[in-house]
Design a protein with these regions (language model features):
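Active-site-proximal specificity loops/subdomain of glycosyltransferases
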Residues: 41-83
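GT-A fold catalytic core of metal-dependent nucleotide-sugar glycosyltransferases
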Residues: 73-122, 128-132, 138-140
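Short internal beta-strands
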Residues: 31-36, 117
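Short, acidic, metal-binding catalytic loop of nucleotide-sugar glycosyltransferases
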Residues: 21-29
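A structural signal for isolated positions on well-ordered beta-strands in alpha/beta enzyme cores
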Residues: 2-4, 30-33, 47, 90
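Short loop/helix-cap segments at secondary-structure boundaries that form the rim of catalytic
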Residues: 39-45, 107-110, 195
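A glycosyltransferase accessory/donor-loop signature
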Residues: 1-17, 33, 135, 140-226
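Short, polar loop motifs at secondary-structure junctions
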Residues: 35-40, 102, 121, 186-189
Length: 226
């Protein structure tokens, strides 16, 4: 099972609880960290990949790159198929806690598809059609994306159009309607997707100062691994 995080080095500490919880429930998982340095001080076994020299978004004069909401590392999420010579990965945001085995999620049948993810609830942001998926947790078929030459299309799109959710919007622009597969809600419980009685992944997206917020719902999951 391949798990990937894309973070600037100053955010790695915030992701440590996510990684600890992942390995407790999935001890054989292999973690890849895409960041802007060669080394990261951590006690968690991982493969660190320095993406600072990549040329995909090196045009600093491009206003849509310079002012991107999520920054350079966030933009590079769409380049996973080229940066990671793997067939398949699970992407996790830093603000997640894993509460169970991810094997069933990992085994999602993505034949011919790009992405397995959880849909956000009706009424949320949907600029590309009737559905929108939360990409903070996603199973990604990197080999199929390479077969479909997806990366150049998404990179050029993000250079030309500044979208509020960058990588997430690019995946939807080119992946809808037929490149997504629905996975169960329990693999990405958050304010946008809904709640479940048996979460496998709790995702604290949309919560102000989530790492320190004492009134945050499901805080007990985070506290266990801090």
């Amino acid at each position: 099972m391949n798990i990937v995080y894309a973070l600037t080095s100053n955010f790695v500490e915030l992701a440590r609880p996510s990684m600890r919880s992942l390995l407790e429930h999935n001890p054989k998982a292999k973690i890849y960290l895409l960041t802007e340095t060669d080394t990261v001080e951590t006690d968690i076994p991982m493969t660190v990949i320095n993406v600072s020299g990549q040329t995909y978004f090196n045009d600093r004069n491009c206003v849509n790159i310079r002012n991107n909401f999520g920054g350079y590392i966030n933009l590079l999420k769409v380049c996973y198929p080229e940066l990671l010579k793997l067939n398949k990965v699970i992407h996790l945001d830093a603000d997640t806690i894993v509460c169970d085995s991810l094997e069933p999620m990992w085994k999602t049948d993505l034949k011919g598809k790009w992405i397995g993810a959880v849909q956000e609830k009706q009424g949320h942001y949907k600029p590309f059609g009737p559905v929108y998926y939360n990409m903070g947790v996603a199973v990604l078929n990197l080999q199929q994306m390479r077969n479909d030459n997806a990366v150049p299309q998404m990179v050029e799109y993000l250079k030309a159009v500044r979208q509020p959710f960058a990588d997430q919007d690019a995946w939807h622009k080119f992946g809808l309607p037929d490149k997504f597969v629905d996975i169960p809600l329990r693999y990405n419980e958050n304010f946008a997707t809904g709640k479940t009685d048996d979460p496998a992944i709790v995702h604290y997206c949309g919560i102000s100062d989530w790492y320190y917020n004492p009134r945050m719902e499901r805080r007990e999951y985070l506290e266990k691994y801090r």
